[in-house]
């Protein structure tokens, strides 16, 4: 996989997890 794609995917997962955590609390 492309390095840029990996970085974007990681950032996307981070943002989603952060949003889910904030909603849970």
Curated annotation (Swiss-Prot):
Leader peptide range in chain numbering: none
Pathway in which the depicted protein is active: Xenobiotic degradation; 2-(2,4-dichlorophenoxy)propanoate degradation
UniProt keyword annotation of Aminoacyl-tRNA synthetase present: no
Catalytically driven reaction(s): 3,5-dichlorocatechol + O2 = (2E,4E)-2,4-dichloromuconate + 2 H(+)
Keyword Metal-binding attached: yes
Signals that turn on the gene: By chemostress caused by the herbicide 2,4-dichlorophenoxypropionic acid and its metabolites.
Molecular-function GO terms, alphabetical: dioxygenase activity; metal ion binding
Cofactor requirement: Fe(3+)
GO biological process: catabolic process
Key words of the record: Aromatic hydrocarbons catabolism, Dioxygenase, Iron, Metal-binding, Oxidoreductase
E.C. number: 1.13.11.-
Cofactor note: Binds 1 Fe(3+) ion per subunit.
Family: Belongs to the intradiol ring-cleavage dioxygenase family.
Protein name per its UniProtKB record: Chlorocatechol 1,2-dioxygenase 1
Organism: Delftia acidovorans
């Amino acid at each position: 996989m492309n390095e840029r794609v990996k970085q974007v995917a990681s950032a996307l997962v981070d943002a989603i997890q952060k949003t889910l955590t904030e909603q849970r609390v």
